[in-house]
């Protein structure tokens, strides 16, 4: 590099003499591109973030120095690097933050202004992403006082070129401008706000390496606070060299100072450097892979970076999932060390005498934080580890765990070993933590954050940081589990009754809610193992409950819930809930009301904890309907199917009589519909159909009617017409082109050869919908599309989401017999545009009759179920089933 710089200097000198401006720009641009290429090659040959930062910073310094000299900026001015460039941490495509510091004057002269504009223009011509400000010393101080971000940026400064004297004045002024208490308050609040922006979790599918909780910005915040404290300490020191050390480039001297001052240990620093390096490597690879400043670890680049780092897809775990686990474990550690260091620095600054309140013989509340009376308590008595979390639940005045206690927890968590887990006292305390009336969610989250939960439950420890790239889950397995538990806790709070009134009412009367929390902890604990995670988790749960002394019936309930935790959502979203046989079968499965209530509460909490996109009012209504129907079936001893049909006929007749419709007018309609019709449709639908169709029993043209769904989100659409083979395909095409998705389709054929189909459609865009004129549009336009004189349109091929493109999900097709002449077709696939329309087309091409369809979208994944047979209830042969399955697989 030094030889290249000297050659560059000679070449520039000759070009300047000749006045060749364009050649000068090309020379610097080539120097930059060649240097950047060499830095990249060296990095990929031997990945070392520190070396890359050093070389990249030197390269840019050289270019800026020549540019500064070329533009003949005032000799009393200085070019100062600030921010990431100032601290010498320059990633491949990071912006260059520059401060052009001018001597005090009333205004920048016209000549100076021209030279500065020339400099900035030159830097842009060179392809550098520059963010610059031009200020005098007094303007710097004014901005720093008004804006904490500006002040922070100015603290991380370095003289690139120009006047050293004015730079020294700048350092002195910045040091004096820092009001340490205010700085700490604002920076901690800034971090809290940043955490809130990312929903207080680092464990998202596409985290921001720089800004997400536990990311590089957490390390920066630690160093900003340390630098501010060190600068303030230096400003009180008579030795001017001490102040220069405080402003020194990079963080090495800051870490050293923390160790000298006994604020951080060498072991802690070693771990910090390890995890910092992981994040820096990922961000560097991300910049190179994206060819721009990209800080989000998006799907587009996860696989490529995982392959570069040597991760392989094995045993059902994607390489990208392994990469993300490494990332999540690093940010988990950084979050903890961030908490330890900030608490330590705040404690260091405090001059107030401690306020101490004794709780018991082992613990105090010191300045609102829990503290042990003896520093060696946890080492000598590991059982007290659980007391830390139990006491925070029992004493709401405690704001958190003191830094000393937090540090001790990190040191002793290795004592949560086999002997600890086998202790009857510790088992009792763990169940006691789960049984507290308040603070269960906070306690378990803290136990997970500090590594205690995974040590006590090794099977939980294995899923910490484990991501699932399945187009459905958006959190790591451990984060999802704790989200489910948090949702259960929300049911316990009367002030949140408005969210889920039924859940709150059921939860308030449920004995032993800690059993629900245990089921939540175990329901996905076997994810990532070979085999069915529900069955494996059930075994773990039963063993855990037995070893913790729970009564047999309680342990069996927890284990049953874990094994059955997908059953209620699957039934609600894949089966026809108006079919009494479905309800009867599900009632026999759950057996009693206690199980039903527990499974309902767990299911709602589980779906809500999976992804913000998955839960909606439609799913809420399905689950609530299944709960109510099943509860009714359990409460009645008579055969539920017979009872349901009789009740529906009676209630529909009463409803129709209120509008003056007598039984004699719709008897023929009901007779032609057949007895099975009353198993497929509910009272409200029967009365709706009867009112509209009684005059049109033998309609010659399609009848389409639409209304707002009386039971929840969406629009309910009824289609009545003579049976035709492409009917379902035409309907799917129509709604697909409207950007509506079908939530449910009830397909029924009357005894006189008419199709009576009812659809629930939902807005696919997530936007608010104006229903003014929409219902009439559907009635008119869909009727036109069903006219046989028009040709069947091909399904649309719209834009797929990035996740669907970049996270391959193998479609799963399952066809199985459910009755003598009926099969169920289950499809799990990426929710690509036009998916349902394509499936409908395939069913038509294979002469398949459809009786019912339940369409379920879970994030970017579709889970669809269809009841099918051959034409006119002809049973499908094995050959036809194979052909149908192959056709769907080929299309998906």
Regions picked out by a protein language model, each given a short descriptive name:
Residues 57-65, 71, 110-165, 281, ...:
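Conserved catalytic core of two-metal-ion nucleotidyltransferases
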Residues 39, 178-349, 512:
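Conserved nucleotidyltransferase catalytic core and NTase-mimicking acidic/glycine-rich helix/loop elements
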């Amino acid at each position: 590099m030094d030889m290249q710089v000297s050659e560059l200097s000679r070449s520039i000198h000759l070009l300047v003499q000749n006045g060749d401006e364009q050649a000068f720009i090309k020379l610097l641009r080539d120097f930059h591109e060649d240097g950047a290429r060499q830095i990249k090659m060296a990095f990929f040959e031997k990945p070392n973030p520190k070396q890359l930062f050093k070389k990249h910073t030197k390269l840019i310094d050289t270019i800026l120095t020549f540019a500064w000299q070329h533009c003949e900026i005032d000799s009393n001015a200085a070019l100062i690097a600030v921010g990431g460039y100032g601290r010498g941490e320059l990633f491949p495509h990071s912006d260059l933050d520059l401060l052009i510091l001018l001597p005090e004057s009333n205004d920048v002269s016209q000549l100076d202004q021209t030279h500065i504009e020339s400099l900035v223009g030159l830097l842009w011509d060179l392809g550098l992403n520059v963010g610059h400000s031009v200020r005098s010393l007094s303007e710097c101080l004014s901005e720093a006082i008004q804006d904490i971000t500006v002040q922070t940026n100015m603290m991380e400064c370095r003289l690139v070129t120009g006047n050293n004297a004015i730079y020294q004045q700048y350092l002195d002024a910045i040091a004096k401008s820092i009001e340490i208490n205010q700085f700490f308050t604002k920076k901690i609040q800034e971090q809290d706000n940043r955490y809130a922006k990312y929903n207080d979790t680092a464990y998202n599918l596409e985290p921001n390496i720089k800004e997400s909780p536990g990311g590089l910005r957490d390390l920066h915040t630690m160093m900003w606070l340390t630098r501010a404290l060190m600068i303030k300490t230096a400003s009180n020191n008579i030795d001017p060299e001490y102040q220069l050390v405080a402003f020194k480039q990079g963080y090495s001297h800051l870490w050293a100072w923390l160790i000298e001052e006994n604020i951080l240990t060498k072991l802690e620093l070693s771990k910090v450097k390890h995890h910092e390096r992981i994040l820096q490597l990922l961000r560097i690879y991300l910049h190179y892979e994206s060819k721009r400043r990209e800080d989000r670890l998006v799907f587009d680049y996860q696989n490529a970076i995982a392959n570069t780092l040597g991760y392989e897809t094995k045993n059902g775990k994607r390489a990208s999932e392994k990469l993300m686990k490494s990332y999540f474990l690093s940010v988990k550690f950084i979050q903890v060390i961030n908490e330890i260091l900030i608490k330590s620095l705040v404690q260091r600054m405090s001059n107030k005498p401690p306020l101490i309140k004794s709780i018991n013989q082992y613990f105090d509340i010191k300045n609102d934080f829990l503290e042990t009376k003896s520093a060696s308590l946890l080492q000598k008595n590991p059982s007290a580890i659980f007391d830390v979390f139990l006491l925070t639940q029992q004493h709401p005045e405690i704001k958190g765990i003191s830094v000393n206690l937090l540090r001790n927890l990190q040191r002793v968590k290795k004592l949560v070993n086999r002997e600890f887990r086998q202790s009857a006292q510790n088992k009792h305390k763990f169940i006691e933590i789960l049984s507290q009336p308040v603070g269960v969610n906070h306690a378990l989250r803290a136990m997970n954050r500090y590594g205690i939960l995974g040590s006590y439950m090794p099977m939980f420890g294995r899923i910490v940081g484990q991501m699932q790239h399945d187009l459905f889950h958006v959190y790591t397995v451990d984060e999802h589990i704790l989200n489910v538990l948090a949702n259960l806790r929300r049911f316990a709070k009367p002030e949140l009754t408005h969210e889920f009134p039924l859940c709150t009412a059921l939860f308030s009367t449920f004995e032993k809610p800690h059993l629900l929390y245990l089921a939540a902890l175990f329901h996905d604990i076997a994810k990532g193992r070979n085999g069915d995670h529900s069955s494996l988790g059930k075994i773990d749960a039963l063993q855990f409950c037995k070893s913790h002394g729970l009564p047999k019936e309680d342990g069996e309930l927890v284990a049953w819930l874990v094994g059955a935790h997908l059953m209620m959502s699957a039934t609600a979203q894949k089966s026809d809930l108006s079919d009494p046989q479905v309800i009867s079968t599900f009632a026999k499965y759950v057996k009693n009301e206690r199980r039903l209530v527990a499974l309902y509460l767990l299911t709602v909490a589980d779906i809500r904890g999976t992804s913000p996109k998955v839960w909606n009012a439609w799913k809420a209504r399905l689950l609530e309907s299944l709960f109510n129907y099943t509860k009714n079936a359990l409460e009645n001893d008579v055969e539920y199917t017979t009872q349901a049909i009789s009740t529906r006929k009676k209630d529909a007749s009463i409803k129709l009589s209120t509008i003056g419709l007598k039984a004699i007018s719709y008897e023929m309609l009901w007779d032609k519909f057949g007895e099975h019709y009353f198993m497929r449709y509910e009272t409200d639908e029967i009365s709706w159909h009867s009112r509209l169709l009684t005059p049109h029993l033998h309609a010659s043209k399609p009848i389409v009617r639409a209304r707002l769904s009386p039971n929840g989100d969406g629009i309910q659409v009824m289609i009545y017409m003579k049976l035709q083979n492409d009917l379902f395909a035409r309907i799917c095409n129509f709604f697909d082109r409207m950007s509506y998705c079908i939530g449910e389709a009830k397909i029924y054929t009357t005894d006189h050869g008419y199709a009576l189909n009812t659809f629930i459609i939902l807005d696919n865009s997530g936007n608010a919908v104006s229903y003014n004129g929409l219902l009439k549009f559907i009635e008119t336009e869909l009727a036109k599309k069903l006219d046989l004189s028009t040709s069947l349109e091909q399904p649309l091929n719209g834009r797929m989401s990035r996740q669907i493109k970049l996270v391959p999900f193998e479609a799963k097709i399952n066809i199985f017999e459910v009755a003598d002449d009926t099969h169920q077709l289950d499809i799990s696939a990426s929710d690509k545009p036009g998916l349902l329309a394509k499936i409908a087309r395939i069913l038509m091409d294979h002469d398949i009759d459809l009786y019912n369809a339940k369409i379920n979208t879970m994030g970017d994944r579709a889970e669809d179920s269809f009841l099918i047979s051959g034409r006119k209830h002809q049973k499908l042969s094995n050959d036809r089933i194979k052909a149908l399955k192959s056709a769907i697989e080929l299309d998906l």
